[in-house]
Amino acid sequence: RSSDLLAFASINLNADQTIGGTALNLLATALAMVIAKGVNHSASAKLDYSNRVFVYDFGPLTVNVFLFIGLVALILSYIVLYKTRLGLRLRACGEHPQAADSVGINVYKMRYIGVLISGVLGGIGGMAYIIPSVSSWNFEVGVSGAGFLALAVMIFGQWKPFRIFLAAVFFALFKSLANIASSIPFLADLGWTQNMYNMIPFIASMIILAFTSKKSRAPKAEGIPYDKGSR
């Protein structure tokens, strides 16, 4: 439950979210390797598992269950954020926490809820990245920076669910292109290595963010610790 630690550090201790998130990212990777090696009773951080329960065949297509989970999460996130009292309070605590506090909303509670929900969704995202595609995973390898690419998707999507979805699809196309580049004749003829193709999503994200980041408006109080006494 690394999201619990991040929530406590950033909300109760007023720690910088970027520094706290980076520290927890390093901690989670190291902890996963320790657990994997403990399970294996060896120096290997690789775990083997069956992923068939998450993958289903629909005619010529192979679809994993996380596709449907993602679509449900997208719809629910929109409904919760824009159609419910909880969503209104969450957004208020991200935009104007002092104003929210003045009408009786518990800003600390709302921010805890937001961070914990984000932690759950992030965990599901990690499972979606690992489980359906392979039947074993080496925790020493990690996810090759996909988490940081997700941050770029959020910024490009301007913190709005459906825009984030479109941004995710856009970057997924580049990711898929990198995976199948060797089977496309004119790309294979370029003689690029697989590592060069794997760089494409990250290069694309930097180029796009360079042109769009100024127009992307984050919640006004994003990353700013809330001090009740500063009203």
Regions picked out by a protein language model, each given a short descriptive name:
Residues 77, 95-102, 106-109, 182-231:
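Cytosolic-side transmembrane-helix boundaries in multi-pass membrane proteins
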Residues 132, 137-202:
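Transmembrane alpha-helical segments in multi-pass inner-membrane proteins
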Residues 29-45, 122, 126-134, 168-187, ...:
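Juxtamembrane/transmembrane-helix interface segments of polytopic membrane transporters
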Residues 29-33, 67-79, 118-126, 150-156, ...:
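Hydrophobic core segments of alpha-helical transmembrane domains in multi-pass membrane transport
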Residues 60-138, 161-162, 166:
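Helix-loop-helix "hairpin" substructures at the membrane interface of multi-pass membrane proteins
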Residues 12-24, 108:
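Alpha-helical transmembrane segments and their helix-start/interface "positive-inside/aromatic belt" motifs
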Residues 17, 28-83, 186-196, 223-231:
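Transmembrane helix-bundle core of multi-pass membrane transporters
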